[in-house]
Each structure stands twice: as structure tokens, then as C-alpha cells.
């Protein structure tokens, strides 16, 4: 991944700083030297690195810093804030709204990934309830319309283009007018890739802009082009005056610092980042979340948004859990949900501390193992799917049949059944009349408020089930009754039986953040 090496080096510099017994001028200078060297070797502009160093030094007065961990935290916070400022021009980007047509024009260099990103962006807005569409106004590159057409069909997004018309201004105007009449919310116009030396194409870009009058112009910036990104971005800014940037190809191995320099030089916000070639590989950009992931501190907000965008079907499982049941079918549904989340390394980078633990782990191996588990459960009968796995314990011949039918080993089938059995036992302790939820009357928040003594009993049961280890960053001592009550309500989606529509992820996130200590760097 782009910036992976930068993240490791920044982590290492902050880790060495944290190990020191006391904070002094020499220690701070060493930290800043290591950080600046890492940024320079990633192609970040020298002027920006000098500004970052100067700003950190202004914020830190070593002579007045408290000794020990508090002094270190002040220095670490200053570093974190300045790294955020590096990628945050503090300019609000345009946001499309439902019921009002918004025209977005995409510009950028040839080969930067504009056409693919157009489809990703249309799908992103469509999933959030906005009617999205695409206009293919790239008549310069052979096959551009065909590529956009294929991507649009895959994303199930309406599109407009022409095989006969060669004037991109005419195509763009006709497409935008058509979709405005059809009351679309987001109209994304794909234009030809162009270089700053190609004055004719730059003039064409201005003509298209004058014809369609976009609400927002977005520049697609390839993370791999290095220090040339700054000069190219300035040329586009002067001509098209783009209001936002999408950085693509962040799944590669280029340095990527040039793209960050371009953002700082043009004072334009990054709105999204492309993390892969697939249609779902587009992430909303948040400066603090980006730097947090870079330093190995995770991005819970991004994780929750990603989970919510996938629209998991949880109704059947929630209903079964309330009754104290967990079936093989529930297990299969959850496997499918996990695979929708994407590569394990991507998820790990969003969870504090997990990115370091994932070093050396192979995404392909993890994905293959989950696929083989799906093969196993897909080879079962309806009766077996609706069981809690006990059927296989009572009739071992079923294990051999499923192994043969799925092309897996008997051991793999037994391991899968064992996992289902573990979840089934947990479900019994959680649901039903005699379970945790049953004793809380189906509404955890209300029951705990009525009788706080049940909180202690619930904690003991969860510890006995191996669920009392806590979450990284949570301070159990700081959790009060109000925190537990709110979280319990969120876990049930805001209600008891009949009203449980799934977890309130954003609410849970806010509650976790309120209870978190400042993260420790080791």
C-alpha cells in the first residue's frame, strides 16, 4: 500500500520517543528529524516539511513541558495535529443533496483512473439514496465510452454517451440536460485525460465547463506520479479551478508524497481515496482518520461507515438470538457479511492496534479459508442448515458426506461445526427466558436502569463466556451505569423484541469514543 512505509517509519519514530524516560530538546529534535526524513523520502515537498517542523517547534516549549507521560503526550499531539494539517486545507467540499440536480465534472491526467472513479463515485452516492448517473464525454481515448458503459452496467447506474458524436461539449451538454429533465440528483461527467502541455485539450475542458456549469469540478490525482503532481495540479487549478481532489491507486507501492504536496499547494480538500481496482474500493477521506490509520491508531468512524453502507441483513439472526438460538444458516449469513467487508488487512487498519498484528498475514489465505467454509455450509441440507450443529455430533456420517460434497477435508468440516457449536452455546446464554436478555426483560437499557444490580450479573456472565477481556482503548474503570445503559440499547438497535432492527453502529461508535482513554503508543 502507498504510505505503508511512511506509516511504519512514523510509528517507529514515535515509538522510540515514547520509550525515553524524560523529554528534552535533544529528544524532540531527534523525533522531528526522523519524521521529516520519512516525509522527504516519500516525495513530500521540502517547503511543506520545513513548515511542519517549524509549526511543531512553535507549539512545543521543552522547558515548560511536564516530565513523564503527560509531556510526551503534548509532543505527540502536536505532531499528530500538524500531520493532519498537511492533508487538511480546512476548506469545505461541495456535498450533493437529494431533490436538487448536482453536476460533477471529473478532470485529470491520462491514465489516472478517471473513468473507473466516475463509476465508483456514482455507486457511492446511489447507495446513500441519491439518484446517480454517468455522462461519457471522453471522445479522445479509444474505448473510453465502452469502459464507462461496462462499469455503469456493473454498478447498475444509468449512463449517456455516443458512438457517432465526436464533440465532447455536445455530448456533455445533451447528457446533463437529459438527466436534469429526468430529475437525477447526481450527474457525473467523465472528460478526456489531458496534460498541462496540451493546450487544445485544456481549452476543450474550459468549453465543457462553460457548457454544463458544474456544481463541482473534481481532479483525479494518481498517487504514483511523484513530485510532478504539484505542478500538474497547479496547471489544472488555474484552468478548471477544481474544488476537490480524489487520490487514486493507493493500493500500489509508489511513494505518494507528491499527491499530498499537490493538495497542500492548491489548498483543495481530498474528498475520496481509491484503494483498489474494484467498484467498491472508494473511501471517503477524513484527515484525522487518515493520519490515525497511518500511525496505527485505527479509524473506527470509517469502519462503522463502511459496515453501514453494506446494508447487512441481520433481522433473522437478531430474532434467533432473542430466542437463544444460533443455526448453521446464521453462521453462513455472517460469513457472507464478513466477506462483504473486503480484505482483512483493510479492516485491520481501521481497528486500533490491529494493523501491526496483521503484518505478514496474507489476505488471500484468509479469504480462501472463509470461502472453503462457505463451500462446506452450502453442501448441507435444509435440515442441517436449520440445526445448531448438534446433528453432526449425533450422526457423524453427515460430516463425511458434507466433506465429499464440498471438496474439503473431514477435519475442515469438523472445525466449521465446532465454531457453530461455540456460537450456539453463547446464544443460549444470551437469549431465551433464562438468558441475559431474558432476565433483562428484552430491553437491556430499561432493565438495567430499573435494577443496576443486574449489570454486575451480566458482566460476570460475559466474563464466564470469554467476553470480558475488554476492547482495546476502553477504560473499564471509567464506564458508568449511563454508558452501559446506552450501549445496551444500541446493541439491540433501540428496542426489544419486535423492534430490533440491527445494531446502531454510529451510536456505538460515539459511546466508545466517549469512554476511550487517549491512545498509548508503544
Curated annotation (Swiss-Prot):
Q: Where does GTP bind?
A: 108-115, 190-194, 248-251
- Organism from which the protein derives: Schizosaccharomyces pombe (strain 972 / ATCC 24843) (Fission yeast)
Q: What is this protein called?
A: Signal recognition particle subunit SRP54
Q: What is its EC number?
A: 3.6.5.4
Q: Which NCBIfam families match?
A: SRP54_euk (TIGR01425)
Start and end residues of each stretch annotated as G-domain: 1-295
Q: Which reaction does it catalyse?
A: GTP + H2O = GDP + phosphate + H(+)
The subunit structure is: Fungal signal recognition particle consists of a 7S RNA molecule (scR1) and at least six protein subunits: srp72, srp68, srp54, sec65, srp21 and srp14. Interacts with srp101.
PANTHER family noted in UniProt:
SIGNAL RECOGNITION PARTICLE 54K PROTEIN SRP54, SIGNAL RECOGNITION PARTICLE SUBUNIT SRP54
Disulfide cross-links = none
Chain residue ranges for the region called M-domain? 296-522
